[in-house]
Structure formats: structure tokens, C-alpha cells
Curated annotation (Swiss-Prot):
Catalyzes the oxidation of erythronate-4-phosphate to 3-hydroxy-2-oxo-4-phosphonooxybutanoate. It is an enzyme of class 1 (oxidoreductase). This is Erythronate-4-phosphate dehydrogenase. It is found in: Cytoplasm. It comes from Salmonella schwarzengrund (strain CVM19633). It comes from the Bacteria. GO terms for molecular function: 4-phosphoerythronate dehydrogenase activity; NAD binding; protein dimerization activity. It catalyses: 4-phospho-D-erythronate + NAD(+) = (R)-3-hydroxy-2-oxo-4-phosphooxybutanoate + NADH + H(+).
Amino acid sequence: MKILVDENMPYARELFSRLGEVKAVPGRPIPVEELNHADALMVRSVTKVNESLLSGTPINFVGTATAGTDHVDEAWLKQAGIGFSAAPGCNAIAVVEYVFSALLMLAERDGFSLRDRTIGIVGVGNVGSRLQTRLEALGIRTLLCDPPRAARGDEGDFRTLDELVQEADVLTFHTPLYKDGPYKTLHLADETLIRRLKPGAILINACRGPVVDNAALLARLNAGQPLSVVLDVWEGEPDLNVALLEAVDIGTSHIAGYTLEGKARGTTQVFEAYSAFIGREQHVALETLLPAPEFGRITLHGPLDQPTLKRLAHLVYDVRRDDAPLRKVAGIPGEFDKLRKNYLERREWSSLYVMCDDETAAALLCKLGFNAVHHPAH
């Protein structure tokens, strides 16, 4: 049995080699000739999986080590009798921590307290719900918008997008990309919405580029109305609008979900799905794969305030480290994908062991996802 895996999928070789022969290949463009000699294909979001890619090949299973699946024609796979699995929620924590890193940076730069801001979360799935939990642990007011969940009668105080635009100081998007249908999200943030954002508002998109109308966003920024923008995703990736990148506060190369833990979770989820598909079910403990974190442990004295949280968060991951490299190479063909391929190792907050002499600080850090313990000072 031969399994093709995206070369950017960590731990894929060591896991899938338990099931058969493994070959690592680039995800964009994928070497089509390899598909004629393989049984399974494991991809990330850069590979478009559809009839034109797989028709006439012996591939009988596709796994994507990503939460999003808009790069996969699931209907065709089903019709062709090809097994499929994604990795929902695998990088949700990573995206939440990206949003926090950006917000804490902007709050320090512009001198505001996050507790004085209302944060509107558009799309309350794996990412949005975790973001809500962490923000509320800090006493930050959130407003939720998720029409499909509201229609299903899910528990939660769901508002309309209009209400969020009127009331929220921060609008952060965490939806799938639906190009049509009743819950279409293509240009969900369209010209009208972008024009109506409060002066001084913050707009964050770390889901899919086309959820925000990039041309309309650039027009608003060029008009000189105060608006802070954080974009990890772009229309037309990998060919982003360079003028827009120059105008935003933080711009990164679709890496919000790129923690070592998130990528490893994605790989293990599709590995477990494929092993079950071929009748050789196996389970993997994530911690057995991950290396020891860079920082052993740190000690925190006293309560947890916003500057301290920012220092801890940025010790693990400062979003600015990914903004500068993109600006340097913007507009040069192939460089966007190169940044993703050669991405520096990044960990999640759970990799930081914090000893606190303040019990409340330790409890709050645990709620936020840090590995914190209360250690009274003697």
C-alpha cells in the first residue's frame, strides 16, 4: 500500500509508515504522476482535491489534515466511492492564540484595555467557541453571530451580524467559506458592512480570504477612516493584494493555525481515520510526538494583568514575527507558499509551564490554556 503525504505535514512519515509505504510530496502543485501509483492521499489546504485531480487514479481515500474543507469536492469523492476525512478543530487553539497575540499587541500599541472593548465573534464553531470561552474568562464582553447555529436552536445568545457591526469594537471572523446557499459567507464582510464599521474598530480575518471583500477593505483604509486590520488570509492566495498588505496593521501568510500542536493534531486525526478505514484502527497520544518546549518553566509573582498576559503570550508567540517576513517578500511569486513551507516552529500556550504565587492568577492562566500551577511563596 502506498500513501502520499503533503511534505508540510509533521509526523506524517512516522505515523503513516506504520500502515504502508509513504512518499512526501509538495502540496501546491501536487505531482500528478505520483497519484497513479498510490492508494491514499493526505493533503493540507493548498491542494485542490476534485475530479480533475483524482479521476482515473487508484486513490481510494483522501485525508485533509485541516479543519476547513473548501479545497475538497466532497460530493464528487462520495460519488466516486473515495473515503474522506478532515481534522475538525485540530488548529482551533492555534487560531485563538493568534487572535489573542494580535489583540494584545494592538492594545499595548494603542493604549487600551481589552476589558473596555466588546468583541464580536462571527462564526461560533471550534475556533469561535474557544475564543469566546477565553475572552469571557478574562471578563471581556463578547457578542456572537452564527445564523446556522441559531436556526438549529443551539444554546447561546446569538445576534444578527447587523447588531455586531453596530455594537462591537472588534469584529473577528471564524466561519467556513460557503460560496452560495442560505448561509453564504463569500464577501460576508462586503462593502456595506466595511463602510459601517465603527471608527477605530478592529477587523480580524483568520478563516478564509474571500469572507472579507479585500477591494472594499482597501477602499475603506485608503479613505483614511480609522480602522485597525489583522489579516491572515487573503483573496486570491497565494497572490495577495500587496497594496492591502501595506495598509493593514498585521498581515501574515495564512499561518494562524500553524502551531506544532495544531499540525500534529491534524496529522493524528487523519491517521486515525485512515487506519480505521482500512480496518487497522490505531490511536496516537499527541504528547508522545511533541518535542520538549523551548522554555522549561517560568515563575510569575502577583496577579495577572493585561501587560503580564501579553508578555506571557508573546513569550510563546508574537504575531509580529510573521508580519515582517511577509512584507519583505510581498508580490514575489512563490514566496507566500515558501513562508508557509519553511515556517518557524511555533508552540501553543499549553507548552509554557508557569509557577504562580497568586492562586487566582494560576486558576485564570489554566482557563486560558497555560500549564499553570499555584506555588505559594515561602
